[in-house]
Amino acid sequence: MDLLNTLVEKGLRRELPSRAEALAVLATSDDDVLDVVAAAGKVRRHWFGRRVKLNYLVNLKSGLCPEDCSYCSQRLGSKAEILKYTWLKPDEASQAAAAGLAGGAKRVCLVASGRGPTDRDVDRVSDTIKAIKDQNEGVEVCACLGLLSDGQADRLREAGADAYNHNLNTSEGTYGDITTTHTYADRVETVQKAHAAGLSACSGLIAGMGETDEDLVDVVYSLRELDPDSVPVNFLIPFEGTPLAKEWNLTPQRCLRILAMVRFVCPDVEVRIAGGREVHLRTMQPLALHLANSIFLGDYLTSEGQAGKADLEMIADAGFEVEGADQVTLPEHRAPAGGCGSEQSAGCGSHEGGGACGSAPAPRTDEARTDLVAVRRRGAGTDLAPNA
C-alpha cells in the first residue's frame, strides 16, 4: 500500500505526515489492519527497538473533583461508585509506589483529583516525591495534579519530579462539549509551564468519546506542536454514573488504527497505551505493543487493570522486553534536551501543517462490554494489596 510505505519513510525521517495521510490511516478497513500495524511497527522499532516502558499509577487523592469533565468517574456530580479518599501520606504513597516498582515499573505517576494544586498541595506532593526517590534509587516520578499556577512547575522540579502530565484529551473544537469548567487553552498553558520549568512534558488524548476522525487528527497534531516526550493514548472507560456511560464507540481494530496514526505523527515520542486498553483492545493488546512502547502496569486511578503478572507475560510472549531502569527511553536526539524545543531543531520533527482533510466512515460500534469495567477496590486508599 503506497500510503503505508510513504508513512514509514516519513516516520524514519521524523517527517510530519499530511493531515490527509493521517486521516487515511483511520479510514483503512479492518481487512488492512495488520498491514497498518506492520508498517507503524517498523517506525516504532526503529526508534525504540523492542523495549516496553512500564509506568505505575498512584492515585494520591480520589474522587470529589469540582470539575465537570464528562468522561471522568471522579467528576462533579459523578454517580460512579468509586473509591473516594483524601490525600495519601508520603509514606503511604511511597509504599504504593514500591509495589509497582517491584513489579518492573520504571516510572511512578502521582495523580490527584481536582482542578489544580494549591501551594500547600505542592508542598505535600513534594514531600511524597522526596520520600519515593529516597527509598527507590533511579526511579522516575511524574506528577499529574491538574492546572498549574505560576511557579508550581518549578517547585515540583526542585522537589525531584522528572515529568508532568496534563492531557489535552480531545480537539480544541470539541473541547467545550466535554468540559465547561476550564478551557482547552488552560490545558495547553499547563503543558507549556511544565516544559518551561524543565520538566519532561507528558500529554495525550482520550479516544471513544464520540469524536470524529478529524477531531482525533486535530488533537494529535496539537500534541505534536506542543512536543511532549510522552503521549498517553486513553480509550474511554464508560463508567456507569457518568454522562458518557453509553459511549461504546470503539473496536479493537479501531484502537489499533488510532495508535498507528499517533505513531506516524509522533514517530520518536514515547507512545503509551493508557486507560481502557483491557476494555477495548482486549485479546488484541499484544498487537498494540508493535505500535506503542509504553504501558501502565496494573490498575488505573479508579478502575482495575489487567493483572500485573499478565502484563509481563504478554510483553514477553509478544517478543518484547521490559525497559530497564538503566536504559534511556527516548532516542538520543531527544533525550539530552527533553524534547525538540523549537520548530527548527531535531526532536519530534518538522512542524508543518496542511493537507486536505476528509471524512472517514463511522467506525463499527461494538456491543457495550460493561462486564469489563471494574471499579478499583485495592491498592492506594485501601487495606488491600495492590495489583502489580
UniProtKB/Swiss-Prot annotation:
Domain Radical SAM core: 47-277
Cofactor binding note of this UniProt entry: Binds 1 [4Fe-4S] cluster. The cluster is coordinated with 3 cysteines and an exchangeable S-adenosyl-L-methionine. Binds 1 [2Fe-2S] cluster. The cluster is coordinated with 3 cysteines and 1 arginine.
CDD domains: Radical_SAM
Catalytic activity entry: (4R,5S)-dethiobiotin + (sulfur carrier)-SH + 2 reduced [2Fe-2S]-[ferredoxin] + 2 S-adenosyl-L-methionine = (sulfur carrier)-H + biotin + 2 5'-deoxyadenosine + 2 L-methionine + 2 oxidized [2Fe-2S]-[ferredoxin]
Origin species: Streptomyces avermitilis (strain ATCC 31267 / DSM 46492 / JCM 5070 / NBRC 14893 / NCIMB 12804 / NRRL 8165 / MA-4680)
Residues involved in [4Fe-4S] cluster binding: C65, C69, C72
Annotated signal peptide: none
Annotated region described as Disordered, given as residue ranges: 335-371
Function recorded in the entry: Catalyzes the conversion of dethiobiotin (DTB) to biotin by the insertion of a sulfur atom into dethiobiotin via a radical-based mechanism.
Cofactor: [4Fe-4S] cluster; [2Fe-2S] cluster
Domain of life (superkingdom): Bacteria
Record note on quaternary structure: Homodimer.
Binding, [2Fe-2S] cluster: C109, C142, C202, R272
GO molecular function, one term: 4 iron, 4 sulfur cluster binding
Gene3D superfamilies for the chain: Aldolase class I (3.20.20.70)
Protein name according to UniProt: Biotin synthase
Gene Ontology biological process terms in this record: biotin biosynthetic process
Keywords: 2Fe-2S, 4Fe-4S, Biotin biosynthesis, Iron, Iron-sulfur, Metal-binding, S-adenosyl-L-methionine, Transferase
NCBIfam families: bioB (TIGR00433)
Higher taxonomy: Bacteria, Bacillati, Actinomycetota, Actinomycetes, Kitasatosporales
InterPro entries to which the protein is assigned, alphabetical: Aldolase_TIM, BATS_dom, Biotin_synth/BioAB, Elp3/MiaA/NifB-like_rSAM, rSAM
Keyword Zinc-finger in record: no
